[in-house]
Amino acid sequence: MDPQARPQSSLLTAAPELSPLEQEVLDEYERLSENMKKLAVLLDELASAPATEILDGLRELERKTSLVFTLLKASVYSIVLQQEIDWGGGAGDGH
């Protein structure tokens, strides 16, 4: 890892008794800690949002998911039906 790529706020800035791998692991843990703090803030904001707003968003997501599932089922049915026509009963229909 490039020493200049380390965050300036690092509490353990290149201690001489640490190997480069140990320092890199500590830097990764520090980044993970920062990401967890950001996640906690986002979850707190989400939890403080009105329940009706969250429910409306989930309902919209459910409708979209249902539509995609219906389209997928129709596509699979169409493919299976076409294969049955091509392989079995479709000899006389010009395909």
Swiss-Prot record:
GO terms for molecular function: microtubule plus-end binding. Coiled coil: none annotated. Keywords: Cell cycle, Cell division, Centromere, Chromosome, Chromosome partition, Cytoplasm, Cytoskeleton, Kinetochore, Microtubule, Mitosis, Nucleus. It is found in: Chromosome, Centromere, Kinetochore; Cytoplasm, Cytoskeleton, Spindle; Nucleus. Pfam families: DASH_Dad3. Component of the DASH complex that connects microtubules with kinetochores and couples microtubule depolymerisation to chromosome movement; it is involved in retrieving kinetochores to the spindle poles before their re-orientation on the spindle in early mitosis and allows microtubule depolymerization to pull chromosomes apart and resist detachment during anaphase. This is DASH complex subunit DAD3. It comes from Chaetomium thermophilum (strain DSM 1495 / CBS 144.50 / IMI 039719).
